[in-house]
Amino acid sequence: MSRKSKKIKKKVFKDSKYDSQVIAKFVNRMMYDGKKFISESIVYNSIDMLAEKLEEVDKVAAFNKALDNVKPLVEVRSRRVGGATYQVPVEVREERREALAMKWIISAARKASGKSMQEKLANELVNSYNSTGAAFKKREDTHRMAEANRAFTHYRW
């Protein structure tokens, strides 16, 4: 039995504008050097742009759909058996799904060239909403990798 104590999950408060915990987590992930005000303004403006481009009434629903389209269902993890290392497909927990989706959307937006961060993030959210773009491609690559290594599922732990 493990001697380590169970990690206590820190509660993330809902954001002030949309009263959504998911958007609050997204803002925190966007943040650099504790500059939350800047991060909030970037995220809020890009959500406004997202709703404007999609002509969507409910901004939070549009944001959540964009995030859901990028969430991975399975991923591969390395498992050493004997002398060989296998890529074993494993189902992803809900919290990790959300975290990976946010991470992929933000990194795809940061890698895009030109324009302001608000516009880049809004474009990536629109692409995610429409199941296209770099973040969605990352999800598809992850699923493809898991599918290719399906033979090793019996090595799960």
Swiss-Prot record:
Keywords: Ribonucleoprotein, Ribosomal protein, RNA-binding, rRNA-binding, tRNA-binding. GO terms for molecular function: rRNA binding; structural constituent of ribosome; tRNA binding. The keyword Ribonucleoprotein applies. Gene3D superfamilies: Ribosomal protein S7 domain. One of its GO terms (cellular component) is small ribosomal subunit. GO terms for biological process: translation. Coiled coil: none annotated. One of the primary rRNA binding proteins, it binds directly to 16S rRNA where it nucleates assembly of the head domain of the 30S subunit. Is located at the subunit interface close to the decoding center, probably blocks exit of the E-site tRNA. Part of the 30S ribosomal subunit. Contacts proteins S9 and S11. PANTHER family: RIBOSOMAL PROTEIN S7 (PTHR11205). This is Small ribosomal subunit protein uS7. It comes from Borrelia duttonii (strain Ly).
